[in-house]
Swiss-Prot record:
Gene: rnc
Domain RNase III intervals: 4-133
Entry annotation: catalytic residues: 50, 122
Range of residues in the leader sequence: none
Lineage, broadest ranks: Bacteria, Pseudomonadati, Pseudomonadota, Alphaproteobacteria, Rickettsiales
Protein name per its UniProtKB record: Ribonuclease 3
An example Gene Ontology biological process: mRNA processing
Compartment(s) of residence: Cytoplasm
Swiss-Prot/TrEMBL catalytic activity: Endonucleolytic cleavage to 5'-phosphomonoester
InterPro entries associated with the record: dsRBD_dom, RNase_III, RNase_III_dom, RNase_III_sf
Pfam family, one: dsrm
Positions annotated to bind Mg(2+): 46, 119, 122
Amino acid sequence: MESFEKLEKLLSYSFKNKELLIEALSHPSLRQHHEYKDDKDYERLEFLGDAVLNLVITEILFRNFANYNEGNLAKIRSYLVCKETICMVGAKLTLKNYIIMTHGEEVAGGRDNLNNIENATEALIAAIYLDSNIETTHDIIEKLWAEFIKVQNLTDYDPKTALQEWAQASDHHLPIYRLIKREGASHASTFTVLVKVKDYEQTGTGHAIKEAEKNAARSLLHRLKND
């Protein structure tokens, strides 16, 4: 496990209360460990972090996407707070290297488990909020999510809906998605999905089936636009 100083440097934030940071990175498996004296883990912080993230992302979208209606804003927010996006933020922070877990959880692939990375990322947001204030937390979230927020094309946010709307407008049957390959261990699988609309088809990969479906839809939309 790497030192917390590196993580704080990536966040551009130094915790005043280091115990909050430790709690945010403590996996629930530690509660079953006889040598672990503290009963705190990241589950309660994750609950708070989820709410803080939704609030901040909603405010950012409301401010930056003035011409988008409620439905489109909801689609973008759904993309920005989904497991895949949160895990990509966690990956930028190399958060898997900092999660405190039992040896058994680590051997079982806990460091690459997307649920663990998502939960720890949300817990970290809550820890920053409790250690500072909503303004500081807002600035950190806006920085970490910047590359995802700046995407203006709704196709990139919700490619499956965009592909479905294209199919309906073109009088085609709705897109059909089929899982064609699964590789890797159960805790770190890569899925390949094939999407087909009429005579058009394209594949996409991802660490979750939904992510693979979105990537397949996005690839097919890009192909249709270039044909």
